Amino acid sequence: MTNILRTLLLATSLAAIPLTATKADAANDTKTTAAKVFEVKNPDFTKSPYSGMTRQHWIEAGEYLLDGAFGHIFSLDDPMYFPKQLEKTYPGNPENSKVAKLEGLARTMFIAGPLLKNNPDLTLHGIKVADYYRHQLMAITNPKSKHFIAKRTGGPSQTLLELASLCISMKAAPEVLWEPLPQEEKDKLAATILSYGEGPTIGSNWMFFNCFALSFFKDQGYKVDEKKLVDWLQKLLDRYKGEGWYNDAPAYDYYSMWAYQSYGPFWVEFFGKHFKPSAESGLPENIYQEISQKFLKNEADLVDNYPYMFARDGRMNMWGRSITYRFAAVTPLPLVEYGNFENVNYGWLRHIASSTLLQFLQHPDFLENGVPTMGFYGPFAPCIQIYSCRGSVYWTGKAFLGLLLPEDSKYWSATENEGPWADQLKPGNVYNKIQPATGLLITNYPNCGGSEMRSWCHETVEKDWQKFRSGENYNKLAYNTEFPWMADGKKGEISQNYGTLNKKGEWEVLRLYDFKDFNNEIYHREAVLETDKNVRYQLNDILLPDGILRVDKVSVPDSTEITLGHYTLPEGSTEFKATLDPGKSFSNRQISLPAMKGEKHGRSVTCYTNGQYELAMIPLYGWTVQEKAIYPDGLHPVSHRCVLPRLSQKVGGSQILVTLQLWKKGANDTGFTARELQPVKSVQVSKDQKTVTITLQSGKKKVVTFE
């Protein structure tokens, strides 16, 4: 599969056909674009007491995003091609941009389809949106057009994804985007798209695109290879593992949600429910309904799991590849209604969706030249993959598929609420939701309102030629909604992970994790170093109301320097920095703590704050050094500088390390108390170094055993 993917991406980046340039082809010319930050006008705090957002506001948000894209369009023939951002993205040469332009077209159409269904006469920057997309659809099969796409002649390609995505949007608003096309144009478009849809694919979420191409044209009366269609649908279902999660060959990430759990229910609602196999296919009469039931059963599983990944206020976590797709993560939430399940809290789901949307639309760094940036908030190269172009960001547009639900639907008519955060997740406690089928762990922290994910990662840098499955998108010990991840530096600047100075003299982080078990609320993993399998970490996470208690054992064949990083804090507000000495971005303070039971001496703890949060990292056992913070530049997705509390020392043989990583919200007002910095009463380690008994101040005991 690796060779296929390599061929695919090289083809995407290099094999496009040089095009005749127009003004918009240059990608840098723009008209006056939308306001920098989206404004919720006339918010409805009766129906939506947290976000103020109603279905109408979602329509306005879609128009706001699409307006920015149309700021680059001067005529019906101009492509959806946007200014390149970050060198690692494609295309490398502006002349080789055909696939990037198709990607911009298909993905902005995710937004346009639902908007046009609501308002077929939508006009942006003096251009009728429906006319533009119909013109572009017909240009695909016009050999005289610079947008012409030839029928497939090779293997899997990005072209398959984008052409099939057009089918999703055409189905969303067929009366505007498909039905007005002349029959001859429909036939030509069917022939081109089916040449890709019935061709080879990759055994991941890509198979959905083949399914949508075949399903759309089957629905329009065209003959398609239904045996292939059913085979791909079955293979997609085979990727399901449990608790709402699909394995995307090989990762668990947001693709489970913005692909499998969005495309599956959409396919059921618009195709599977009413499909009948053709007589010549020889397929069972109810095969499509049987497949539909399986997709919906899997969708039902996510309802009691996935929403817990979001913060109390509805913000999403920075985790996994393609994170620049951002609020596409909420796409499956409204589509839950297609399953007609009982006891669904639609008000909570909509609160999450609207809050995540505003998390980005109201961030000042989200747009540049009217187009979403290549990053999480602003541009941030470490979280971007080489398969992305600037138009890729409009994958976010799938979130607007929820507009296909009517105003009086359960989803849009429910009153926003906080779900279990309101009365079930109580302050002073921590709540873990293990996902047994995958080993993922979701943790909720009512004290701060944050949520945390412990992730899948088992990929070597050597085999990860695209350099994202082995990287920070997956390899952190944990991901928290309150602390977007910092990229690793070359000098040991490593957050929320262990780093080991390997035999090459390079800092190497853990990435080859194996999940072992989750017993007595202890999350147990093991990991080895990629460059030296004799370097072994036994990892145990004990989650506390205000942070993480790590009970780990590192084993090394030779004396080796290691480091363990906490989460990081970006620079605080201008108002906060105004309270500091000139040139400072953070403040810190020392707190003296008494000795724990069984200790002779107490300890001094340094707490760091940016005005919004305070962090503390406290060595309890095995460390011979005190925590010391560093202030990396250019590694954080939110600000240029951040603060990273960390511990670093040399270890030899086997060493047990017990560490507290704590945080407190609203630290500018109060900060940690000495009591809050002492959740652990005692740490007892057996003489054979195989058992650690932790006694918490609450009286609870946690016992960790090592080999």
For each of these PLM feature ranges, what is it?
Residues 28-103, 131-136:
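Low-complexity, Ser/Thr/Pro/Gly-enriched N-terminal "stalk/linker" regions
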Residues 83-93, 377-380, 420-425, 533:
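Short linear interaction motifs
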Residues 358, 386-406, 410-576, 583:
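Catalytic and substrate-binding regions of extracellular carbohydrate-active enzymes
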Residues 478, 491-707:
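Extended repeat-based interaction scaffolds and adjacent low-complexity, acidic/S/T/P-biased segments
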